[in-house]
Amino acid sequence: MQNNIIIFDTTLRDGEQALKASLTVKEKLQIALALERLGVDVMEVGFPVSSAGDFESVQTIARHIKNSRVCALSRAMDKDIDIAADALKVAEAFRIHTFIATSALHVEAKLRRTFDDVVEMAIQAVKRARRYTDDVEFSCEDAGRTGVDNICRIVEAAIKAGATTVNIPDTVGFCLPTEYGNIINQVMNRVPNIDKAVISVHCHNDLGMATANSLTAVQNGARQIECTINGIGERAGNTALEEVVMAIKTRQDIFKGLDTRINTQEIHRVSQMVSQLCNMPIQPNKAIVGSNAFAHSSGIHQDGMVKNKNTYEIMSPETIGLKKEKLNLTARSGRAAVKSHMDAMGYQQNDYDLDKLYAAFLKLADKKGQVFDYDLEALAFIDMQQGDEDRLSLDVITSQTISNLPASAFVQVELDGKKISQVSNGGNGPVDAVYNAILAITDMDITMLHYNLTAKGEGAEALGQVDIVVEHKGRRFHGVGLATDIVESSARALIHAINAIYRANKVADLKSHKISQ
C-alpha cells in the first residue's frame, strides 16, 4: 500500500459553494496558482456544466496549472462528462470526477430509481469518462448513510468499469469516526478489485467530525483526502486541508511512514489568501491557522514557553510559514525593505505589483507611523482584487454626525475621468450617508445584502476591512475596501462593487452587440 496521502483540494468547487458571491475568474486562478505552490496533488476547480462562467474558470485554470492535476466534477450523465472533458482538455494532466447518489433516501426520493439502475448509471458514467482520460474518480454520494453491502457492490462495479479512484463521502457529516473507519475497513477487505483503485474520503463537518473521520479513514486504508483551505464549504464546511496535513506530519507516532507532498510553509499564506478573496474570516481559535493558534496568554503557559517551547507548543508556527512580525517599516522605509518583508512572508514577485504596493504602503505609513507585515499582506490582497479598468475612484470624503440628527456626507469621486461631487443629508449614520451620495452620483440601483467589518491588526490605528455583497439586476457582486477609517473603507468597498458592476455590464453589452451582428 502506498505511503503518500494524496491531497485532493476542492476549495474552488465545494468550498466556493459556501460563498455569498462567486469568485471572478482572476480570483479563482490566483487561488489555483497558490494551491499549486502549496503542493496539492489534485485540485477540483469547478462543475463546468453548471454555468458558462464555471466552464470558463475550469478552462482558464486548466491552461495555467502545470504541477498539479486539474479535476472537474460531473454528474453521472453523458452531457456533464462531455462538457467537463471539453473544459479540461487543455490541461497538462486532468481528472474527471463523476458521482451519483447511493443512499436509499437519495435513490428513492431524489433519483426515483432502483439501486440496480444506479449501479448501471455509475458503470456507464465511468466508461464515458474513460474515453477522455485514464484518471477517473467515482463518488458514491451520501455513502455515510448507504448500506455497506451496496457501497461494496457499486465500488466494485465502478472499478471494473475503469475508475482509478473511488470516493466514499460522508456528504452530510453524519458519521462518527468509529462508524466511518468501519465503512472504509469493510470496503478495503470486501471489494475484490480494490487493489486497482485508490480509496478517497470526502467528509463534511456538520457534527464537527470532518478531520477526525478523514484521519480515521487513513488509518483504515484510505489514501486520498478531499479537503478545502480553512475547511470552507457548504453548511458547516469540509475537512480542513491544514488540519489533516499537520496532523499527519505532527503525529508520526500514529501515521508511521505516511506523508503528503504539501509544502507546509505555504499554509499560512494560502489560508490568508483564501480568507481574503472568499470574504470568509478565519475564527481566532481555528486550528493551525487561527490568530490564537500559537498564542499563549496564561502566565503559567508563558513561563513554560520561555523555558521550553515544547511544553505547550506541539508544532512550530514557522512550520506553516508564520513569521514573527517586525516593527521596523515606516514611511522612511524603501522599496527594498517592503519587498524584503514580502519575500519573508513567502510571496513571489509575480504575486503582487510592487509599485502599487509601495505607493499604498507609503500612504498607510504616513497615517499609521509603523506598518506591520499583516498590513502589507492586506494591502497586497486588496490590490489583487482591483480591476485595471476602474471607471469610478474615490477622491474626497467627509461625513458629519450630530446627536439626534441624521448624518450628512460630502463625497467627491472621479467617474470616467470627470470629478463629480455630491452632498447627502438624512443618512442613518455616516456610512449610510456616504453610500447615498455615491449611489446618487452613479444612479445605480443596488440592494445591500451583506456588510462585514474586520479589523486587520491591533490597536486604535488598525486597518478596517469592509466586505460587502450587493445585488444589481438579479446578480450579486462583491466589494472590499481597506482603510484606517471605517467610513472610508466602506466607501471603497462600495466603489469596488460598482466597478465590478460596470465591467459586468460592459461584457453584457459586448455580448449583446455580437449576437445582434
Curated annotation (Swiss-Prot):
What are the protein's UniProt keywords? Answer: Amino-acid biosynthesis, Branched-chain amino acid biosynthesis, Cytoplasm, Leucine biosynthesis, Manganese, Metal-binding, Transferase
* Localization, UniProt: Cytoplasm
Residue positions binding Mn(2+):
14, 202, 204, 238
Question: GO molecular function terms here?
Answer: 2-isopropylmalate synthase activity; acetyl-CoA C-acetyltransferase activity; manganese ion binding
Superkingdom of origin organism: Bacteria
Instruction: From the UniProt record, give the pathway where this protein acts.
Output: Amino-acid biosynthesis; L-leucine biosynthesis; L-leucine from 3-methyl-2-oxobutanoate: step 1/4
User: What is the main EC category here?
Assistant: transferase
Name this polypeptide is given: 2-isopropylmalate synthase
Q: Can you name the source organism?
A: Histophilus somni (strain 129Pt) (Haemophilus somnus)
**Organism lineage:** Bacteria, Pseudomonadati, Pseudomonadota, Gammaproteobacteria, Pasteurellales
